[in-house]
Amino acid sequence: MPESRRLVLLAGVFLLTLVNLTQSGPIALRTPEDWDNVPSFGDRLLKKRSPTVSERPGCKEGATIPPNRVNTTKRLIDLRIQMDLYNVSAYIVTSDNAHQGEEVAPHDHRREFICGLSGSSGTAVITKDAAAVWTDGRYFLQAENELDCNWILMKDGEAGVPNITAWLREVLKTDEKVAADPTLIGTTTWQRYDKDLAPIKFEPLLTNLIDVIWTTGRPPVNTEPGFILHLNYSGESWQDKVDRLRAELPKQGADALVITALDEVAWLLNIRGSDVPNHPVLLAYMYVSSTQLVLFAETSKISSPEMQTHLTGVTQRPYDRFVAELPDLAQSASMVLIPSQFVYTGGASYAVYNAIPETKRLLKPSPVLMMKAKKNTVEAEGMMNAHLKDAVALCDVISLMVEEIPKGVRWDELKVSAELLKYRAQQEVNKGASFNTIAGYGPNGAIIHYSASEETNAVIGTTSLFLLDSGGQYFDGTTDVTRTLHFGTPTAAQIKAYTLVLMGHLDLARLVFPKTTRDARVDVLARAPLFDQGLDYLHGTGHGIGHFGSIHESPTRVALGSSVENTFFENYFFSDEPGYYKDLDLARLVFPKTTRDARVDVLARAPLFDQGLDYLHGTGHGIGHFGSIHESPTRVALGSSVENTFFENYFFSDEPGYYKTGDFGIRIESILRVIPTTFSTEFPDRFFRFQAVTLVPFERKLIDVTMLSDGQIDYVNDYYVLVRQKVGAEMTKQNRTRAYNWLISQTEPLMLPEPVNKGVSIANKQVWVGIWTQLFISMFVVFKFY
């Protein structure tokens, strides 16, 4: 073959190889404008192709179809007919209602209807010839089961998975149109989509296309009236709360505020409702200024004489008039604060944002969010009391399971949920569950937010682990607790996995830390024991929790994800330089490649914090190669401008876990309260610590005590003393003998096994200690002067 032909052939093979390595193969250049938007060669080179349906294990030839998989073919056909009528090339369906909360009423489960995924988090995107769902790690396994093979599963955050706008740019032409309902997408998200999709058009469509096609089997809207949360539970009148809010607005640069989050309306006015299952809220909006206080709610929800008396001084308007009346309300304001997305709070919808005159818009987190998170004394003590009652109910059910399951009495996942509802209802001022119980036996426990159904309901046996995550709503507080149990003889692997999770749980729970510590920075403490074994879990470690409110309450979120700090990369060099002690913890850390640098700082400081000490500099910095001594971007330090600091009487969860797909799941979750602590050091009032709120024993048979540190053992034993004092006394008061006996058996002190006696007497041991001590001193002298 001539040399020139050989070179041409090699060049062709090389180009084909590059095409196959790029993200989406050859680029179709259909219009002159397409040339302006071609991704650069560098952007496309060596990028993984986007996921496809054929890559899903459950969609391969011969795969078993899960019993809970939903057939969406007819629904997609109907939706695409509507898309054609409105000249829409892609339609985005979120999980939200008009208030952008995490949980929505069944009537608003539009995303679940179109795709079949029943988890609380996810976004569906439908084009004329494809459909994809983005969801987070809590729902990867669940989505694989529930999504039929019309759907591409986009595992958000995983390598090679594009975000929504990147995928749409990949599959659409620049002259096509993407649409969504502007009342169901938060402003921050809408603006990001609009910017990232350009030049593809992203337009609001007020006709909701899912509503058009969802004509049968749609759950009705709740009609139950709202009710008052009286002062003995709320601890502060709504009038005083409004006064505090009005005083805060000028500090935020505004003289008016839109409130769209349901839990913020409920908290501010001391009212509750039943419009969202497990969340005591009613559908409502508010507008607040120095002279205006307007509540938009269904008249039937607030029409009782008692409610009308309670709301004296509040202007009341129909719920569905909110967006239409906003322009008139805002006329007298110079600047209107519109809530932005913040942690678990979705912020105001784009429709609400758009209704405020452009020159008067101030988009930032709602000040009500921060006010609500700081529990007053009555709320804080109510939370403690609610968790005490809840512990009695939960222990009662667990003790019954421990008694009956080994005897062969049938218990399945749905029965556990039903029994928990029944036993919690026996406690004072209980108002049902705070979320749908997660009761997963064996492989079901590995589905992080598993929800048992008639199709998946498993009988609980004695060979695998049982994960139980549940909570209750009470007038005096909201609870959330997870314990992992075993009703037989666990394997060594199960014990090791459980103990690793427990170690992380304990290390976070017993932390002492400066008051300026950012919440996300303590996450690594809970994960470190798992990291050391090459393990991790795909969810946050902790979340804020409301007072007779939301199970996930902003602003507290203990999780590794952040948009500010930098992740570590291979061959980064940085310093590890805490003061006051020998810093082994950080140096021996094993951690995921996505870990943010600042998140490991607390490992180096924790031993000092425990003694009321600290050092006033960063723990580590990047270092150059024959260059800068302080090299960007690596900086290991507690300071940050994004996450939130803890405040006294914040309540949040501590819930590390481990999930072995197809085998079992482990999670241990307790609620902690932030309280001050003092030391006789140069930093006397610098520190917070956590107070245990959840008072439920750990599973003794799953704990390998030899893996625990002395500090961890001491913490568990002190915790068990508290559990006996508080919960044991309440059980005695309520005559719950079975639960009490189980509680006592589970809270015996943890003790290390006695060492095996090899026949060496105490006297001989003392002799040998003396010999080794003298030998060490002699060696030290020799080496020192050698």
What does each model-found stretch correspond to?
Residues 5-24, 770-782:
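Cleavable N-terminal signal peptides of Sec/SRP-targeted secreted and luminal proteins
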Residues 63-64, 212-254, 260, 374, ...:
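Flexible inter-domain linker/hinge segments
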Residues 68-75, 79-84, 399-429, 505-537, ...:
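Extended boundary segments
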Residues 73-112:
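Intrinsically disordered, low-complexity, positively charged segments
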Residues 129-133, 150, 163-221:
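Hydrophobic or amphipathic alpha-helical targeting/insertion segments
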